[in-house]
Every structure is written in structure tokens, then in C-alpha cells.
Design a protein with these regions (language model features):
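ATP-dependent carboxylate/acyl-activation modules
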Residues: 1-266
Length: 266
């Protein structure tokens, strides 16, 4: 039965600086005039995640080919080129993402093509049209989400990347605080999870690194009710390591009705 099942111990990863994160979020909300909700700039989201021990792979916003080449030279080849246009973001199938770009000539050609594709779509407000990012090792793309429920607090979601996951609702959910057993269960719950464990002859991936990311996000979300929503997309799980390539965070006034129902007694 559920009560007899092994429930593990609450996760407490080292290097999660929740108090500092809360002060930082408060300063951003103050500077913005205390809006009901504020979407953080990418660099702010990365700074917040760093306080939880989660590193976002470096990227540079760019407007044109010259800026893109300069960014790639700073980051080191090869790089990825990504459109920030919402309709093309994360959409390699539509041409909005170009991977393993190895030199300036290839990058310039890709910039021209991606900008042409983006011309028919609404831009992302206040953002450069493109970003250049350091390449991460190849692996399986996953998505980590957290949303703040006024009654239950943070609800953590996990699934593999791609349209199929969203269309089929192949996501697993858990309410924080999480135990090590909860974290292991949420990674294994989606129907597509076997892709992380050596499916059809593929090498097993570094699930422990993915679980560490989930644990850190869960603790940050539990300690920071001002973090209304978070999405890490994608988190690429490789043979060694899990790499956060994109993050969006929305913050605002805390509205959590914390209580004993969020942590049932044993």
C-alpha cells in the first residue's frame, strides 16, 4: 500500500542558497514596481538558477551575422544558433535551431536563413532575434517545469522533449517537498522514460545528473513561493551530465497558503 511503501528521505542538495535567491527576486520585483507577475530576462533566470547550483549553458543574444560570429569566437566552436521568436524557439524541425555550426561561413549562412524564417512571425518582446550558444554533448532532450499552486505549493513536472510529449500528456508530476524516492519515481514515470535507460541499444544516460537538477529545482521552488513558474527546456541528458540549454522563470507576489497538508505525516 501507499503508506507501507518506501518514501525515502527529503532531498537537500548542497549549494542551494534560497535566502540569497529570495533577496534577489525581491530586488527585481521592487525595481519593476511590484507587478503581479514578472518574466525574468534570460540572464536573470540563469543567475537565479545558479543560486540553486543549476548551471545554464552560456549563450549570447545577437542581432546579425557579425555579432553571431563574434559570439561564437568567444564561446568556442562548434556552437548552436537559435531563434528567439516564440513560434520557432526549440523548433529544429522548423529551422529555428541550428546545431553543430563549425565555422564563420556556415554560421553566416545559418543566420541569414533563420532570420528569413523568422520574418513572418511575431518577435519576442524586448529580445534580440537570435542567440548563439555553446554546444552541449548530444543526448536526450527533457523538460523540467515547476508551477506554484496557491494550496499545494510548487508542483514539479517532468517529461521528455518534443511535441509528442505535449500531445499525449506524457508528463509526470509531484508536489514538493520531494524525497529521493520521489525524484527517482518522477524520472521513471513518463511512458517515454525508457529512452533515458538504454532503449533499443542506445547507451544509458546520466540519470543521476538529471535527478540532481530536479532535486535542486524542487528545493528552490519549495523555498521560494515568489517563483510562480519555471521551465527548463531543454535539459539535455547525455552519457555524462545533464545540460540546461534554456530557462524561463516568472516571479511575483507570494500567494501560497502553506500548511501541514503539503507534508503528510508518516
Amino acid at each position: 500500500t501507499w503508506r507501507a511503501a518506501e518514501r525515502g528521505t527529503l532531498v537537500h542538495p548542497e549549494g542551494v542558497h534560497s535566502r540569497t535567491a529570495r533577496r534577489l527576486v525581491d530586488s527585481w520585483l521592487d525595481a519593476a514596481g511590484r507587478p503581479a507577475a514578472l518574466e525574468l530576462a534570460p540572464e536573470q533566470a540563469a543567475e537565479l538558477l545558479a543560486l540553486a547550483g543549476v548551471e545554464v549553458v552560456p549563450s549570447v543574444p545577437v542581432h546579425d551575422a557579425d555579432e553571431a560570429v563574434a559570439a561564437a569566437q568567444r564561446l568556442g566552436w562548434p556552437v548552436a544558433l537559435k531563434s528567439t521568436v516564440p513560434a520557432l524557439r526549440h523548433r529544429a524541425d522548423l529551422g529555428g535551431v541550428r546545431l553543430d555550426v563549425h565555422d564563420a561561413a556556415e554560421l553566416r549562412a545559418d543566420v541569414a536563413q533563420v532570420l528569413a524564417l523568422a520574418a513572418g512571425h511575431a518577435p519576442a518582446p524586448g529580445r534580440a532575434p537570435l542567440e548563439v550558444q555553446a554546444m552541449a554533448p548530444h543526448g536526450v532532450a527533457t523538460v523540467v517545469r515547476s508551477s506554484e499552486d496557491p494550496l499545494f505549493g510548487p508542483v514539479l513536472g517532468f517529461g521528455l522533449g518534443g511535441d509528442t510529449t505535449d500531445l499525449l500528456g506524457d508528463f509526470a508530476y509531484a508536489v514538493t517537498p520531494l524525497t529521493d524516492v520521489d525524484v527517482a519515481d518522477i524520472v521513471r514515470a513518463p511512458r517515454s522514460a525508457p529512452r533515458l535507460f538504454g532503449y533499443r541499444g542506445m547507451p544509458p544516460l546520466d540519470v543521476a545528473a538529471l535527478e540532481d537538477v530536479l532535486a535542486r529545482v524542487s528545493v528552490l521552488a519549495d523555498d521560494l513561493p515568489e517563483m510562480l513558474a519555471l521551465e527548463l527546456n531543454p535539459v539535455v541528458v547525455a552519457e555524462r551530465g545533464a545540460y540546461v540549454l534554456g530557462c524561463t522563470v516568472r516571479v511575483g507576489a507570494a500567494a501560497r497558503a502553506d500548511g501541514p497538508r503539503r507534508a503528510l505525516p508518516g
